[in-house]
Amino acid sequence: MWQLKIGADTVPSDPSNAGGWLSTLNNHVGRQVWHFHPELGSPEDLQQIQQARQHFSDHRFEKKHSADLLMRMQFAKENSSFVNLPQVKVKDKEDVTEEAVTRTLRRAINFYSTIQADDGHWPGDYGGPMFLIPGLVITLSITGALNAVLSTEHQREICRYLYNHQNKDGGWGLHIEGPSTMFGSVLNYVTLRLLGEEAEDGQGAVDKARKWILDHGGAAAITSWGKMWLSVLGVYEWAGNNPLPPELWLLPYLLPCHPGRMWCHCRMVYLPMCYLYGKRFVGPITPIIRSLRKELYLVPYHEVDWNKARNQCAKEDLYYPHPLVQDILWATLHHVYEPLFMHWPAKRLREKALQSVMQHIHYEDENTRYICIGPVNKVLNMLCCWAEDPHSEAFKLHIPRIYDYLWIAEDGMKMQGYNGSQLWDTAFAVQAIISTELAEEYETTLRKAHKYIKDSQVLEDCPGDLQSWYRHISKGAWPFSTADHGWPISDCTAEGLKAVLLLSKLPSEIVGKSIDEQQLYNAVNVILSLQNTDGGFATYELTRSYRWLELMNPAETFGDIVIDYPYVECSSAAIQALAAFKKLYPGHRRDEIDNCIAEAADFIESIQATDGSWYGSWGVCFTYGGWFGIRGLVAAGRRYNNCSSLRKACDFLLSKELAAGGWGESYLSCQNKVYTNIKDDRPHIVNTGWAMLSLIDAGQSERDPTPLHRAARVLINSQMEDGDFPQEEIMGVFNKNCMISYSAYRNIFPIWALGEYRSRVLKPLK
């Protein structure tokens, strides 16, 4: 049976085992790893797990998101004495009472406290993208480490996951809810074959997948990221790739196109890609590789027109078509530049560029304890370390950190979009629980969460000359996940700061000792340092180049990836954190903070659409953007009666309320940039929570509380018998077009919305 282990328990006690290759800043606080123990589990436990798996499989086309049941079953067993309060239901014509809300909240927090880890964070599924596991399996296959790293049980669960998320037409999407794409279909087909599935295995599923691929143009029509993965594997030729010259890293930084000016996720993915392209690295050509060459193309492999294939992309994948200027650039580099740099004397410069690229790869690896900023560059960096030296210590140090990314649920084993969302979820959970005015009842929960947040703050900048490594300051920041990951993020720092400031207002005998003042000042310093000249805040760093650089975006599947754009979410979070800090520490950098808040609020108003909406770039979508837009403006001092932006924002949200109450927004809003209801106009508890929080903050209860009452009824009636809330459609997004799971949101936002509703709507009505 699978068992989730947390923190120091994830490390093998035998130092000769993988634990000897792990380093940590804080005894692995926040680390979450699934282990398989064949001796664990009673027959009843195993039957319960099997039933959950079967139920998911039977309903996989109607409900594509797992409910994270394996983790919940484990925590339920560990907290077997837990008995919740009786369930509450509110009839359609019945008023929502404070008693009903309070009992719902107690039931919700009681349950949510049972799935909190001992170190204070809330573990959960952060999967969703369907292109992550293939990169891992391809890398492990090339390096010969597949069976050593992924046990038979790991491989079985990965296959389960892929079969469960295969679409009816035989293909796979970019993410679990998306229609089939060539990128998803080819990579997941290849993954199954590398894991030992035969071309006719899977009850016809593999054959059906191959048919989808061939019917839609074959692997020659895969996206550029897919072409790269197939090239290193040996089932596609490097001649069919558009160039990624590593010499870009030798250019002067003053050039707008220097990689150091790109969004960190973009540059950290293309960094190892440059290395692999520059070396024209190809793994061993084995019988399975030769077989895949025959299976994936419409013509014999040696007859594929690789030059034509460079710019081929299946229409199903084409979210961001290449502009003409890009095609001209790639053609020039391919036909003129690359032939020169593959031969002496220019090849000497290529070798120098490759050495420089590897230095940056090693810097990233070492400063994230080999976790890396995300799963794509994690496995690419690992492959580069092996390509540089198959026996290197760097390669061995990468291996144990693979497990930080793997998560298992009833739908199988997936690779997460980060090493988790630990800090982010914990900071939100703290704010949600405190909003209920029931904090004193949850001393243990809040004390543990407080400790996690304190333990996860980044305490030092990265070593060396930050400018040379293109890094921003990080001392005082909070990361998205764990301190060992360590990349600083503007909104994570803001939400972490908001949480510890709220906790500092509660008695220390309830929530533990407050964080040191200097660490608060350090966090404020990071936030202030991240404001752009337009007043907005981007994610990890300042915006370092121009929007026109997006013309060079080579990834057909994603939008807005080249530079770190300012966002309503990051700008709002910064305002809220600084405004909260200013109330408690009015003498610290007051003028800078006031100016920062004013400029950020002006920025938020400037990017509001004419219909009153804000596009949410990290959640689905206009309800998420609206929540941040409204809360940011209110925190900056704007009010409904003196701010037209707030009035328009409220009108927009109210216009999207469903007839029966609540809000339900589809992920299609993100990719199409038009508000779209979920199929059948169903409410979603997370969208409903965001909209409620927005309207409450904007004073809706003083004008007409009816929409809030209807929404509260939706949330109360959605609660499950044990106090949990149901997992509904996917609610996270990145780069406009790829969805990602935030499994904790199903608990956090009903609690938060009902908490604010109880304290700010119902109580004042008394």
From Swiss-Prot:
Keyword Repeat: yes
Active site per database record: 491
Coiled-coil annotated spans: none
Xref: Pfam families: SQHop_cyclase_C, SQHop_cyclase_N
Molecular-function GO term, any one: cycloartenol synthase activity
UniProt entry tagged with the keyword Repeat: yes
GO biological process: triterpenoid biosynthetic process
Catalytic reaction equation(s): (S)-2,3-epoxysqualene = cycloartenol
Keywords, sorted A to Z: Isomerase, Repeat
GO cellular component, one term: lipid droplet
Residue stretches of each PFTB repeat: 155-196, 520-565, 597-637, 646-687
Cited function: Oxidosqualene cyclase involved in the biosynthesis of cycloartenol.
PANTHER family cross-referenced by the UniProt entry: TERPENE CYCLASE/MUTASE FAMILY MEMBER, TERPENE CYCLASE_MUTASE FAMILY MEMBER
Protein name stated in the entry: Cycloartenol synthase
